[in-house]
Structures are given as C-alpha cells and as structure tokens.
Amino acid sequence: MQEIERVVDFLQREELTLTTAESCTCGLMASLMGDIPGCGQVLDSGFVVYSPKAKNRLLKVDFETIERFGLTSEEVAREMAIGALNASVAIIAVSNTGVADDDQEDEGGTQCYAYALMRGERQVVVSETVQFDGDRVAIRKQAARHGLTQLP
C-alpha cells in the first residue's frame, strides 16, 4: 500500500486532483486511492466504463475509434482519459482499457493506459501498453497499481 500512499502524497504536494477512467480494472484504481487517508483531497471522480456504449455515452469515446483500433488500444485509452478530464474538474486523468483473459484479438494481460494532464488551457496526453501475467484477478490488480504508480 506504500506505493499508493506515495501517489496520494505526490498529488497532495503538487496540488493535483485526479479522475480515473477504468474499463478492465472496473474501479480498482479509484478503490485503491480510497484506501488511503486524505485521498478525498486529491480524488475528484472515477468512471467505470466497461461497455463501448458507456465509453461513448460518459466519456465521448468515438465509436469509430473503437471500431478502427479495438477496445484494447492506446487510442481508446487516450480518448477515455481526455473524456474523463472534460467530464470532471480534475487536473490529471488516468485511463485503463485491456483484457484480463485471452480473446480473439488480444492476449490476456494486455493493458493500455493514457494519462491526460491540463496545462493551462492545453491537454497533454501520453499513453502506453503493458503486458501482465497471471489469472484474471491478478492481472486486474497489477493493472490498477501500475496505472496509479506511474503518476509520480
């Protein structure tokens, strides 16, 4: 838990507020933050958007992006992070989309992330794809921790 405490400390020190946009992790990132005293100062909101329709409806992820790049893609993660920033008052957003089990398109454990930050009036976005091993539960836990621990 110390690593998540460091994330909360970092956000407090830098006076940043966070929103999460989670698909595969189903709210685990926000839940991990909620375990830490003082998280209420830095956690603005969390979006759990598992289905394509929820991604579109709540975060304005374009169906065309989903169709072209697939649900497990940095492009979708980027639109999720930007959508979460736009739908909240947070300064930074982290998003996750991926697969915990093998499917027709992607190997189980493939996780895509995006981090969006407000810099004045501009949004800056970076993204990455990471591969985790283990069963469904282990992959989701690793994915949630990774998404948060990349912030500081």
PLM segments and residue spans:
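Short alpha-helical segments enriched in small residues
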Residues: 1-152
